[in-house]
Amino acid sequence: MATLLEKTRKITAILQDGVTDLQQELPYNSMTERLANVIDCNACVINTKGELLGYSLPYNTNNDRVDQFFYDRKLPDEYVRAAVRVYDTMANVPVDRPLAIFPEESLSDFPKGVTTLAPIYGSGMRLGTFIMWREDGEFTDDDLVLVELATTVIGVQLSNLKLEQMEENIRKDTMATMAVNTLSYSEMKAVKAIIEELDGEEGHVIASVIADKIGITRSVIVNALRKLESAGVIESRSLGMKGTYLKVLNTGLFDKLAGRNF
């Protein structure tokens, strides 16, 4: 059996891998799977809204309702509201308590089941909860030491990623503002007409058709698209006789144009 020191080293190695993008589906899935393996339990990481950031279920509860929670990537609101009120690690919650993650209809199947909840903090804010559960066998002090280590590092990672995303959003907003401000009135009118022709964030347009539709020259559209592409707000590709393929890279463009009437 691995010693506490060996397990600590394993968890440290796992956490050093880090996470680079919170926007991807289940960004902490791989990490949670490896943590669950070291601690020997089922586990999941949720944010303060109850959305799953990662989970691992080596021990199946064989319950359709619980399986659906993980399929939907979200725990029940009632459970989440109770979980976010846990401010310090709560270990070995019995199976018949509200914070136990075991389904009520299956309590008799897991009489010795226990749940442990550990809050995740970063930069002084509550960012989520690390939840672990076992069908049999309480979490020991050694297990809880590993849990505290894991939640501390996850909290630092989450706060750093949130800061990076905030900075990236500010950068994109600034770039979108600057790009729109370089457009003349006619060019802005053209861009808004083009955006309305797209299917969401991408699509193909025919400049001459749009030019005739809003009463401007084709060159105005070409100049407007060139400015936006130079600013990294859109990308375009000629489709020959079919027109031009456009993709909006910076969705802040939509907000900058939304309040303008022509």
UniProtKB/Swiss-Prot annotation:
One of its GO terms (biological process) is negative regulation of DNA-templated transcription. It is found in: Cytoplasm. It comes from Lactococcus lactis subsp. cremoris (strain SK11). One of its GO terms (cellular component) is cytoplasm. Belongs to the CodY family. The keyword Transcription regulation applies. The lineage of its organism: Bacteria, Bacillati, Bacillota, Bacilli, Lactobacillales. This is Global transcriptional regulator CodY. Residues 207-226 bind DNA. Keywords: Cytoplasm, DNA-binding, Repressor, Transcription, Transcription regulation. Residues 1-159 are annotated as: GAF domain. DNA-binding global transcriptional regulator which is involved in the adaptive response to starvation and acts by directly or indirectly controlling the expression of numerous genes in response to nutrient availability. During rapid exponential growth, CodY is highly active and represses genes whose products allow adaptation to nutrient depletion. The keyword DNA-binding applies.
